[in-house]
C-alpha cells in the first residue's frame, strides 16, 4: 500500500491580533500554540490554508 503524502506545519508567531480568517486557517490545520507542530495530509485545501498564513508558520515537506 502507498502512504498518504503529508507535510508538517509549525506555528511560529502568535495568533493574537490576526485576521479572523487567518486564525480560522490555523485552527483548521490543528495549530493551537506557538511552536505547536502538526502533520497534515498534502491536499490542495490544507496547502491553501498553510499558504494563507505563510508569514506565521514554518512548512516542512
From Swiss-Prot:
Signal peptide: none annotated. Gene3D superfamilies: Ribosomal protein L30, ferredoxin-like fold domain. CDD domains: Ribosomal_L30 (cd01658). GO terms for biological process: translation. Keywords: Ribonucleoprotein, Ribosomal protein. One of its GO terms (molecular function) is structural constituent of ribosome. InterPro entries: Ribo_uL30_ferredoxin-like_sf (IPR036919), Ribosomal_uL30_bac-type (IPR005996), Ribosomal_uL30_ferredoxin-like (IPR016082). GO terms for cellular component: cytosolic large ribosomal subunit. It holds the Pfam family Ribosomal_L30. It comes from the Bacteria. Part of the 50S ribosomal subunit. This is Large ribosomal subunit protein uL30. It comes from Francisella philomiragia subsp. philomiragia (strain ATCC 25017 / CCUG 19701 / FSC 153 / O#319-036). The lineage of its organism: Bacteria, Pseudomonadati, Pseudomonadota, Gammaproteobacteria, Thiotrichales.
